[in-house]
């Protein structure tokens, strides 16, 4: 799963994989990420997924090879072939083996699973987004993240050190308008 593209694999090897920074910024824009469909496990109507798929089709991807990893990062399954068909098969496998009934708790402890997934603070919301579904109302989420590479970029550092929620919201709205 991917916390705003729905699932990893397939079209992600093109976007963000080999695209320009400008294209990645547009795909990862506030406007796109703020869509209610830009969420873990959601592909239908997901603007980020749809944009990634359009980019992959634009360059006429003929073949993909994707794998699923276990907790020890060992390959447990693989899919190859048509961009959409092979990706759909992988998604079905992941849905079957990774989804479980939701359990809520007052305190949820989470991580991204180690380097490079927790390389900086910018990457950390992935763990929080997943934990959010498990935290009860007024629950507490404790995120464990090494951040070996620091904050994750000057723009991100500026955003999280801005101050008030209104200042942050204004900044994000400005960014959203710039990427319409």
Regions found by a protein language model. Give the residues of each.
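Gly/Ser/Thr-rich active-site loops/lids in small-molecule metabolic enzymes
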Residues: 15-32, 125-143, 159-176
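Long, well-ordered mid-to-C-terminal structural blocks that present hydrophobic/aromatic surfaces
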Residues: 92-164
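Conserved small/polar residues in nucleotide/adenosyl-binding loops
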Residues: 178-180
């Amino acid at each position: 799963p991917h916390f705003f593209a729905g699932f990893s694999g397939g079209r992600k090897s093109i976007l963000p994989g080999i695209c320009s920074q400008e294209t990645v910024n547009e795909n990862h824009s506030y406007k796109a990420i703020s869509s209610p469909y830009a969420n873990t496990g959601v592909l239908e109507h997901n603007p980020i997924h749809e944009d990634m798929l359009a980019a992959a089709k634009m360059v006429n991807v003929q073949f993909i090879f994707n794998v699923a990893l276990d907790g020890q990062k060992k390959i447990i399954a693989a899919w190859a072939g048509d961009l959409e068909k092979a990706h759909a098969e992988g998604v079905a496998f992941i849905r079957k083996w990774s989804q479980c009934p939701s359990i809520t708790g007052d305190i949820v402890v989470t991580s991204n699973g180690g380097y490079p997934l927790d390389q900086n603070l910018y990457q950390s919301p992935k763990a929080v987004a997943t934990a959010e579904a498990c935290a009860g109302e007024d629950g507490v989420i404790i995120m464990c993240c090494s951040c070996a590479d620091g904050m994750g970029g000057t723009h991100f550092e500026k955003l999280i050190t801005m101050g008030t929620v209104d200042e942050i919201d204004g900044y994000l709205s400005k960014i959203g308008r710039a990427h319409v």
